[in-house]
Amino acid sequence: MLIGQVSRLSAIPPLALQHTLRPLHSSSVLAAGGKRPKQSPSHSRNSPRQKPDWEKRGSNRGRSEQPRASRFGLKSSGTTSFRSEPPRARRVISDSSSGSSASITPKGQHVPTSSRRLLPFSSSDTIPKPSHRFKLEPATMPPNLTPRSFNRDDGVTEEYINGLPAYPTPPTTLANEEQARPRTFDDFGLEEGLVKSLKGLYGEDGKTTPIETLSFHHFTQPDIASAPIGSQRVLLGAETGSGKTVSYLIPLFHHLKRTDPGPSVTSSFFADSENTLHPRSIILSPTHELTRQSTQFAKILTHNTKLSVHGMSSTVSGGVGEKRGSVDVLLGTVGSLRRMFGMTRSEEEQEKEDYIRGKRIWQDEQEKGMVEGDKVEWVVIDEADVLLGREFYLDTISVLSQVKQANLILCTATLPPFLINLLTTNPFFTKKEPFIHLLSPGLHKLPPKLLTRFIRPSTTGNKHGDVAHQVRLTLAEDAKAAKAEGREGEEPSKIVIFCNSDKQVEQVSGILGTKKIDCLAWTGAGEERLRGRNGSLNDFLQRPHLPGHEPPAPLPSLEPRETKPIFQDKNGTTPNVSQVTRRRVLVTTSLLSRGLDFHPSVSSVFLVQPPRDVLDFVHRAGRAGRAGRPGRVVVFGIDEGGTLGEGAKNNKGGKGQGPLKKDGKTALGDRLKDVLGKREVVGAMGKRVRT
């Protein structure tokens, strides 16, 4: 057995099992349409105090109505009521090598929450420990209120290290290079059909990635194969573009095939098979786009094993379609599964996810429960830090509650402290064996061949103009490199631009249009987001296929039109670009930043606005440079020191070299430097300043 490959967390004390803990904060930046959840403006200091919220605990007040401060456990001193006001000044402890020093966080300045940062991987004796005891609230506490142990007036001192809360997080470790070394697909004793599919995709000499090695080795152990259903609880963590989807799909298919009851079990096996669907496994994803891509990839991997795969986001109705009886793998969003399990919402509680372009996804006859969880053996939660975060936690738990007993796999590219804490303190997850952690050595690192390019602002202050100029320069640079390397016949390079809101997407795409740069604007409520299919988005997504099975051609743009060349060489000609071209620039939000595998032609990712924190940065930047390919992330609004927002704006003269902020104003700071690889600073006109 591979020694040291996994780390088991200590069992929770029996007393803690008597209480309930909701997740503190969310690691989710995904709301409907890729928008961030709206928050009520903070009250002024002279505004009247609110009535105690303890009286409202039985109410069904929506999360969107909850004041920002109460979400984060901020309360005024001397009262038990939650109040929407900025936090008071707090002591911040610095663990610099020169010694510890204390500073005061200015009043009214929001300290980043502990869930919006990356888990530090240090030896257990150096992990910061809070000075206070971690207290769990009684089960009567409603899920929309924050545990009092993180309130400001509970009489407990809270420590901060480098401006971040010292979260009471159990330690965990990464696998080492030897444990995660590449191995051939034949080394693990996988089902023959799965090995054949893997070799068809990655070649006869193909080898595993680190997270695939860890996962395949663990799930093919003899004791795992014979373990009872419900005993397997695994957390898979690896950097973006490292094969996490394969790392959970292959073991899942391996065990489903080993326990396949055979062709004798048909739809007629179930008494109510004409009306319901009985999946053997469920895969949850945060978005319809990711669900569709995972469904397509799952069908490719099971081509030689003949397992049945059904994706709910691939149907026009958004449900199970005409599928009934038994199915091996069912993929869907949390909202889709809630519907199919019969957990409907009132009109006031209906999510925007239920609508696309103003039309309902669901057909009336599919609003009632059409899926039964009695036969589910495996549940996979993809992008677990999102689905177990604030915005999706209650819905995710409600779906899991419909499954009587199943093995559980969590998959994530970022591991915020709240997730580990949740899995080791929440009774929902501590009723059984502790989670086994399979963490890649490269977790919380950007892809090794991804170049980070910081763009200094121009003296004109026209950021959108700078973006358009950088788009032209980047595509020209890619065309020149392709010509030099003899790759002129390949698909032209593409760019994905991330914005923080739908409105910003509209603004950026409009400016690019005026600059004769045709682009695809993709938002939750966008005109090109279709029900049941990706449409023009397929131009930018990976299209895997087995030998002899060519991938479906991506759909052309809805309104193809002639476009002028967006760049020309010295002779005035446009290299490798036809007069009628597909769109090569995608402008979107965080809606597409989670889990999606973009086509190799996507060479660059642009971050037009500063990301909210390092988690956002890692996920957005990780859409390029995937699977060992070179790529670049072009960053606007952040200088090379990692300063965000106002810190970048305050740099006069377009220098972009302001001092690194360490006052807790943002969550990047030192953590940004930890995830970056190769980097360079470029002026607004494209001249390299330094590397």
Curated annotation (Swiss-Prot):
ATP-binding RNA helicase involved in mitochondrial RNA metabolism. Required for maintenance of mitochondrial DNA. GO terms for molecular function: ATP binding; ATP hydrolysis activity; RNA binding; RNA helicase activity. Its EC number is 3.6.4.13. The Q motif is unique to and characteristic of the DEAD box family of RNA helicases and controls ATP binding and hydrolysis. SMART domains: DEXDc, HELICc. It holds the Pfam family DEAD. PANTHER family: RNA HELICASE (PTHR24031). One of its GO terms (cellular component) is mitochondrion. It is an enzyme of class 3 (hydrolase). Residues 225-433 form the Helicase ATP-binding domain. It catalyses: ATP + H2O = ADP + phosphate + H(+). Residues 50-68 have a biased composition (Basic and acidic residues). ATP binds at residues 238-245. Residues 31-148, 644-667 are annotated as: Disordered. Residues 1-31 form a transit peptide. A motif (Q motif) lies at residues 183-213. The lineage of its organism: Eukaryota, Fungi, Dikarya, Basidiomycota, Agaricomycotina. One of its GO terms (biological process) is ribosome biogenesis. This is ATP-dependent RNA helicase MRH4, mitochondrial. It is found in: Mitochondrion. Belongs to the DEAD box helicase family. MRH4 subfamily.
